[in-house]
Design a protein with these regions (language model features):
Chain A
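STAS-like cytosolic regulatory interaction modules
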Residues: 1-72, 84-135
Length: 135, 168
């Protein structure tokens, strides 16, 4: 497993959110952990977005997992930055995308599909969900 | 600890007031939301606790970002029992501020498909990263709250109601 890049949000001196992009052979794994609640998440994650744009096209990827199971909350201030991260995946690497999420979580079941832009046919065709119980 | 009775019929109430708003220096929305999430977790399923958490965080964040009368008070009230979850957030507001919020509530309340309204708004505003109302829209589209806004004695009073059918 090779870590490609990661991004982190600090709030009050503590790490409250981090996302890591890892490569396991040809399998890209993006994890999302913690909460996004800060006013301007781009302040912390713009470098991560720039790094994703640089490193993802250089990888040989056949499938991707985006794991949201440990992302407990995203307020509306965080919607666009999540969209930018998932866009980087859909636009820069090929193959199927599995989205891991919590089965009975309102934000992951109702709003996350909007942020993934599943209304776009080509994105929906590449995407499947793996619903898991809350950890 | 009593093993009898239906824990999801437990009546819980909480009222929190902070004044002046100007003295708030940290993530008060997160603190209040997480406190209520943990408190309700003793009695109610995670999905209900999450609804309370989301609504408190979004509504209190709105107050902290938009309330212009900073020497006034923020009030948060929670009431839950087997029938409904009701969260009320109040802050001082001018009549013009109330009118602006009220117009936004009317659009959200009249939407035939709240989820489509949220999706269309997110996609339309993504270009300039504009926010304005996404938090309120997600409370109806995602968490299925019924929202109302009233103007009472100089306070903007936002109420979020979730009927507990199927959970209690």
């Amino acid at each position: 497993m090779k870590v490609l890049t990661y991004g982190e949000i600090m709030d009050g001196g503590l790490s409250v959110f981090h996302s890591v992009a890892k490569l396991d052979d040809h399998h890209l794994i993006l994890t999302f952990e913690g909460v996004i609640r800060v006013d301007n998440p781009y302040r912390y994650l713009h470098t991560y977005l720039e790094e994703l744009a640089k490193v993802l096209p250089r990888q040989s990827v056949t499938e991707t997992t985006m794991d949201f199971v440990k992302m407990r909350f995203c307020n509306s201030n965080g919607f666009y930055v999540i969209m930018d991260i998932v866009d980087a995946v859909y636009n820069l690497v090929p193959g199927r995308v599995t989205v891991r999420r919590i089965a009975d979580d309102d934000w992951q079941c109702e709003t996350l599909p909007i942020l993934l832009n599943l209304s776009e046919e080509h994105i929906a065709a590449r995407t499947n969900f793996e619903d898991v119980k809350a950890p | 600890m009593s093993a009898g009775g239906n824990r999801t019929q437990t009546a819980v109430g909480a009222s929190i007031s902070i004044a002046p708003l100007d003295h708030v220096a940290g993530d008060v929305a997160g603190l209040l939301g997480n406190f209520l999430f943990d408190l309700l977790g003793m009695f109610y399923p995670r999905q209900i606790c999450s609804k309370a958490n989301v609504v408190v965080i979004e509504l209190v964040t709105n107050v902290m970002e938009h309330c212009s009368i900073r020497d006034g008070a923020l009030r948060v009230d929670l009431k839950i029992d087997g029938d409904e979850l009701m969260i009320t957030v109040a802050n001082p507001a001018t009549e013009d501020e109330f009118k602006a919020v009220s117009d936004r509530f009317t659009i959200i309340a009249n939407a035939e498909d709240p989820r489509k309204l949220l999706a269309d708004t997110v996609y339309r505003r993504r270009i300039d990263k504009a926010k304005g109302g996404l938090g309120l829209m997600r409370l109806t589209a995602e968490s299925k709250f019924k929202l109302t806004a009233e103007y009472e004695q100089g306070f903007l009073v936002v109420k979020a109601l979730f009927p507990m059918r199927g959970f209690a």
